[in-house]
Amino acid sequence: MSKPWLFTVHGTGQPDPLGPGLPADTARDVLDIYRWQPIGNYPAAAFPMWPSVEKGVAELILQIELKLDADPYADFALAGYSQGAIVVGQVLKHHIINPRGRLHRFLHRLRKVIFWGNPMRQKGFAHTDEWIHQVAASDTMGILEDRLENLEQYGFEVRDYAHDGDMYASIKEDDMHEYEVAIGRIVMSARRFIGGKDSVIAQLIELGQRPIWEGIAMARAIIDALTFFAKSTQGPSWPHLYNRFPAVEFLRRI
């Protein structure tokens, strides 16, 4: 049987598909088992994020088709971190699992899927990365409204590594977190962090002009979001960082 393919997609701010980062570093640890196709032609841009995701989706679809059509005996695996997890999640949900999807013919060849800090995480579906952070609680899910569903019913294995406190991957169904979902929509559509009416800051201010009875939950959500972003400069204490080694072990079990 042919060596399986591993397709990896980096997170925001990591446009070099071969550079350091969770997906690429994980792939380098399993090159004795997998053929590796990192996804380039994808800007991994913070602003605007959704067009960046769409470019990643298009490139991942293209590479899967090229590699799997060329070798009908090869199985494959997917791995994505943060924005890259959105790319993988979009392709998995809408193009592989979907019976009308462009890649549905390859569903039976998909063996493993890995997410780290996944904004599309299915509610209650989380795995530990055996590191310093608590795994996300069973009543949490990803921040995007378009989430993965019913992953347990398919023939491929999934590891969705999610930390408690990772705002992208671990929110609850309550008033405060409804506003965090709104903040997630802002991040997807904003063209810059500050400056102009289409910036994150301008849209957060607009969000803050909701009726007073919504104010407490909204304020808590914004404070939570700003605290989360501020911690991004604090190294391993930021809950959106992950340990890759459980994923390496998972990929090696084929």
Swiss-Prot record:
GO molecular function: hydrolase activity
Active site: S82, D166, H240
Keyword flag Transferase: no
EC number, UniProt record: 3.1.-.-
GO terms (BP aspect): defense response to bacterium; killing of cells of another organism
Annotated SUPFAM superfamilies: alpha/beta-Hydrolases
Keywords tagged on the record: Antimicrobial, Bacteriolytic enzyme, Cytolysis, Host cell lysis by virus, Hydrolase, Viral release from host cell
Family: Belongs to the L5likevirus endolysin B protein family.
Role, per record: Endolysin that degrades the junction between mycolic acid and peptidoglycans in the host cell wall and participates with the holin protein in the sequential events which lead to the programmed host cell lysis releasing the mature viral particles. Once the holin has permeabilized the host cell membrane, the endolysin can reach the periplasm and break down the mycolic acid-rich outer membrane. Cleaves the ester linkage joining the mycolic acid-rich outer membrane to arabinogalactan, releasing free mycolic acids.
Protein name: Endolysin B
Native organism: Mycobacterium phage L5
